[in-house]
Amino acid sequence: FSLFLVFSLVGCAVNPVTGKQDFVMISEEQEIQMGREYNSQILKMNPVYEDQELQEYVQSIGESLALKSHRPNLIYRFTILDSPDINAFALPGGYIYINRGLMSYFSSEEELAAVLGHEIGHVTARHSVRQYSQSQLMGILSAAIEINSGRTAGNIANLASGALLSG
């Protein structure tokens, strides 16, 4: 119970989108640092699409949308990856990626804006941060159960927390 109370007090922040309390264990500065580190990994594994004019165009549209978001002061980085996959995704701290494969399906600026807006929504609502915090909490709770109840109970707690986090 005392562990729960500590995490309840330490890990609550107001979600900028919903205005409600959210359980998060990292600050905005830590979120940005996490995004920076993940960005470095993403760019090592995925080449950037080599069309500077198109990159600037996507950045411009993304920035204009981000200025109207719930976190307009965050610096957003929009990057087209040279991948044929039909995908877009966001990392903590304002890093947003869209694959060349998805770009080829757009027939209007509005369609691009809709996808970028969706990804901005993930960043502004801190979805990755909340998921990371829940994962950390489940790991801590599993370790506490294992210490207090033995390895089998800890393994069961790990399995249960994994199932909860994966949906």
Residue spans for each PLM region:
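Sec-dependent bacterial lipoprotein signal peptides
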Residues: 1-12
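A Zn2+-metalloprotease active-site environment signal
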Residues: 12-167
